[in-house]
Amino acid sequence: MQRGARVQVIDPHGPAAGASGGIVGALAPHVPENWNPKKQFQLESLLMARSFWAEVEDMGGLSPGYARLGRIQPISDAAGLALAQARATSANSLWGDAARWHVRRSEPTEWTVPSPSGYEIFDTLSARIHPKQACLSLVAALQARGVPILTDGTDQGAIIHAT
Protein backbone atom coordinates (compact mmCIF):
# COMPACT_ATOMS: atom_id res chain seq x y z
CA MET A 1 0.00 0.00 0.00
CA GLN A 2 2.80 2.42 0.78
CA ARG A 3 4.02 1.88 -2.78
CA GLY A 4 0.60 2.45 -4.32
CA ALA A 5 -0.67 -1.12 -4.51
CA ARG A 6 -4.40 -1.72 -4.28
CA VAL A 7 -5.07 -4.27 -1.57
CA GLN A 8 -7.91 -6.41 -0.34
CA VAL A 9 -7.72 -9.01 2.42
CA ILE A 10 -9.73 -12.21 2.08
CA ASP A 11 -9.65 -14.39 5.17
CA PRO A 12 -12.34 -17.11 5.19
CA HIS A 13 -12.25 -17.41 8.97
CA GLY A 14 -11.94 -13.69 9.71
CA PRO A 15 -8.89 -11.75 10.85
CA ALA A 16 -6.96 -13.18 13.79
CA ALA A 17 -9.09 -16.34 13.91
CA GLY A 18 -6.01 -18.53 14.21
CA ALA A 19 -3.90 -16.17 16.28
CA SER A 20 -2.70 -17.03 19.74
CA GLY A 21 -4.47 -15.19 22.53
CA GLY A 22 -1.37 -14.86 24.68
CA ILE A 23 1.74 -12.74 24.64
CA VAL A 24 4.62 -14.21 22.66
CA GLY A 25 8.29 -13.50 23.18
CA ALA A 26 9.22 -14.74 19.74
CA LEU A 27 11.02 -11.67 18.49
CA ALA A 28 14.53 -12.55 19.62
CA PRO A 29 17.82 -12.11 17.77
CA HIS A 30 20.07 -14.81 16.41
CA VAL A 31 23.24 -15.15 18.47
CA PRO A 32 25.79 -12.57 17.31
CA GLU A 33 28.29 -14.98 15.77
CA ASN A 34 28.88 -16.70 12.43
CA TRP A 35 27.17 -13.71 10.82
CA ASN A 36 25.45 -14.18 7.47
CA PRO A 37 22.88 -12.39 5.28
CA LYS A 38 19.95 -14.14 7.02
CA LYS A 39 21.09 -12.92 10.44
CA GLN A 40 21.66 -9.40 9.06
CA PHE A 41 18.16 -9.36 7.55
CA GLN A 42 16.69 -10.51 10.87
CA LEU A 43 18.61 -7.82 12.78
CA GLU A 44 17.33 -5.11 10.43
CA SER A 45 13.78 -6.46 10.78
CA LEU A 46 13.98 -6.47 14.58
CA LEU A 47 15.30 -2.91 14.54
CA MET A 48 12.48 -1.75 12.23
CA ALA A 49 9.76 -3.45 14.27
CA ARG A 50 9.39 -0.67 16.87
CA SER A 51 8.64 2.04 14.29
CA PHE A 52 6.54 -0.33 12.15
CA TRP A 53 4.22 -1.31 15.00
CA ALA A 54 4.04 2.29 16.26
CA GLU A 55 2.91 3.38 12.79
CA VAL A 56 0.33 0.58 12.62
CA GLU A 57 -1.02 1.60 16.03
CA ASP A 58 -1.15 5.28 15.03
CA MET A 59 -3.03 4.48 11.80
CA GLY A 60 -5.59 2.13 13.30
CA GLY A 61 -5.83 3.28 16.90
CA LEU A 62 -5.37 -0.23 18.35
CA SER A 63 -2.30 -1.46 20.22
CA PRO A 64 -0.56 -4.52 18.75
CA GLY A 65 0.85 -5.37 22.17
CA TYR A 66 4.41 -4.86 20.90
CA ALA A 67 7.27 -3.83 23.17
CA ARG A 68 11.02 -4.22 22.86
CA LEU A 69 11.74 -5.09 26.48
CA GLY A 70 14.85 -7.24 26.18
CA ARG A 71 15.52 -10.74 27.44
CA ILE A 72 17.36 -12.20 30.42
CA GLN A 73 19.16 -15.54 30.01
CA PRO A 74 20.87 -17.25 32.95
CA ILE A 75 24.40 -18.53 32.31
CA SER A 76 24.97 -22.05 33.59
CA ASP A 77 28.74 -22.39 33.95
CA ALA A 78 32.22 -20.99 33.23
CA ALA A 79 32.18 -22.21 29.62
CA GLY A 80 28.81 -20.53 29.06
CA LEU A 81 30.14 -17.34 30.65
CA ALA A 82 33.16 -17.28 28.32
CA LEU A 83 30.90 -17.84 25.30
CA ALA A 84 28.49 -15.11 26.44
CA GLN A 85 31.38 -12.65 26.87
CA ALA A 86 32.68 -13.45 23.37
CA ARG A 87 29.18 -12.93 21.99
CA ALA A 88 28.94 -9.57 23.80
CA THR A 89 32.05 -8.42 21.94
CA SER A 90 30.61 -9.71 18.67
CA ALA A 91 27.23 -8.05 19.30
CA ASN A 92 28.94 -4.74 19.96
CA SER A 93 30.62 -4.99 16.57
CA LEU A 94 27.60 -6.30 14.63
CA TRP A 95 24.74 -4.43 16.32
CA GLY A 96 26.57 -1.16 16.94
CA ASP A 97 24.64 1.27 19.12
CA ALA A 98 21.27 -0.15 18.01
CA ALA A 99 21.13 -2.83 20.73
CA ARG A 100 23.26 -4.41 23.42
CA TRP A 101 24.18 -7.91 24.63
CA HIS A 102 25.21 -7.35 28.27
CA VAL A 103 26.86 -9.98 30.45
CA ARG A 104 26.20 -8.96 34.02
CA ARG A 105 26.01 -10.30 37.55
CA SER A 106 22.66 -11.94 38.16
CA GLU A 107 20.36 -10.11 40.56
CA PRO A 108 17.87 -12.68 41.87
CA THR A 109 14.30 -11.40 42.01
CA GLU A 110 10.88 -12.99 42.42
CA TRP A 111 10.44 -13.30 38.66
CA THR A 112 13.92 -14.29 37.41
CA VAL A 113 15.37 -17.76 37.05
CA PRO A 114 18.38 -18.39 39.32
CA SER A 115 21.68 -18.39 37.44
CA PRO A 116 24.03 -21.22 38.50
CA SER A 117 27.09 -19.16 37.51
CA GLY A 118 25.89 -15.96 39.14
CA TYR A 119 25.88 -14.24 35.72
CA GLU A 120 23.24 -13.61 33.09
CA ILE A 121 22.87 -12.18 29.61
CA PHE A 122 20.54 -9.25 29.04
CA ASP A 123 19.96 -8.37 25.40
CA THR A 124 18.07 -5.20 24.53
CA LEU A 125 16.94 -6.42 21.12
CA SER A 126 14.35 -9.05 22.10
CA ALA A 127 10.71 -8.05 22.02
CA ARG A 128 7.27 -9.44 22.75
CA ILE A 129 4.01 -9.11 20.88
CA HIS A 130 0.39 -10.15 21.37
CA PRO A 131 -0.45 -12.07 18.15
CA LYS A 132 -4.22 -11.57 18.20
CA GLN A 133 -3.92 -7.87 19.09
CA ALA A 134 -1.26 -7.46 16.38
CA CYS A 135 -3.59 -8.95 13.74
CA LEU A 136 -6.49 -6.77 14.85
CA SER A 137 -4.22 -3.72 14.94
CA LEU A 138 -3.14 -4.42 11.34
CA VAL A 139 -6.78 -4.82 10.31
CA ALA A 140 -7.71 -1.49 11.91
CA ALA A 141 -4.79 0.24 10.16
CA LEU A 142 -5.76 -1.28 6.80
CA GLN A 143 -9.41 -0.36 7.25
CA ALA A 144 -8.40 3.21 8.12
CA ARG A 145 -6.80 3.32 4.67
CA GLY A 146 -9.91 1.96 2.98
CA VAL A 147 -8.78 -1.64 2.52
CA PRO A 148 -11.69 -4.09 2.39
CA ILE A 149 -11.42 -7.01 4.82
CA LEU A 150 -13.56 -9.86 3.51
CA THR A 151 -14.37 -13.45 4.42
CA ASP A 152 -15.20 -14.29 0.80
CA GLY A 153 -14.21 -12.79 -2.51
CA THR A 154 -12.60 -13.34 -5.86
CA ASP A 155 -8.90 -13.11 -6.55
CA GLN A 156 -7.94 -10.03 -8.54
CA GLY A 157 -4.54 -8.84 -9.77
CA ALA A 158 -1.35 -10.12 -8.21
CA ILE A 159 -2.15 -12.66 -5.50
CA ILE A 160 -0.09 -13.16 -2.35
CA HIS A 161 -1.20 -15.99 -0.10
CA ALA A 162 -0.07 -15.42 3.47
CA THR A 163 -0.28 -17.78 6.40
Question: Language-model segments: which ranges?
Answer:
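Conserved FAD-binding subdomain of flavin-dependent enzymes
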Residues: 14-71, 81-91
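Flavin (FAD/FMN) cofactor-binding and adjacent substrate-gating region
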Residues: 57-59, 63-145
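Conserved acidic E/D residue at the C-terminus of a beta-strand in Rossmann-like folds
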Residues: 9-13
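Short, well-ordered coil/turn residues at beta-beta hairpins
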Residues: 162-163
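N-terminal Rossmann-like FAD-binding beta1-loop-alpha1 element of flavoenzymes
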Residues: 1-8
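A conserved short coil-to-beta-strand element within the FAD-binding core of flavoproteins
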Residues: 148-159
